[in-house]
């Protein structure tokens, strides 16, 4: 480490704004020269493993590793009209790092959450079309929704749980009957619409990884118009397999 820059202004310490000033006189020739000197198999970053099964170790990941990964993931985004993303998982982990590169590659505007405690507020504020999470975050979100449903008047509660049961039957791999589609449309109008509003009313995709997601939870989100894509991998594979 040669230099440390603070975000906020601190007397006697270099500030982040100085980096902007350093980049003002752009030398296009120098930029192209540096770009051309980078090879696909050069190390782009070193990311440490989580240490779940063994002592954490630094993994050398190349430019080729990341590019092959986010180009594959891009096929999902190409099918959707998504232009904003919310990031809140640690960027020192390969999961969020790779998805951040994916957002940038596809020209998305990336917002960074203030904290996990303010995640709900930030979702409603920036209205992202996509975010990635671990199952525990989705489970806590689902639990909050359930708690609100439990505290509703009797008739509303009956409709709420009817919509949940309907959602748990959803299967996007199968053709849905017209009767189920009609009930699902009704459930969306009465229940799921409010869920989406609580998540910013623009969310289309949630990427889940790091652990197994409960199938009934994923089905319910899909039924509510929010597609949940699950992936698995390892730091060494940068990370999606």
Model-derived features with residue positions:
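Conserved AMP-binding A3 loop
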Residues: 44-70
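Structural core segment of the AMP-binding/adenylate-forming
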Residues: 1-22
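Conserved AMP-binding/adenylation subdomain of ANL enzymes
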Residues: 67-84, 91-192, 202, 227
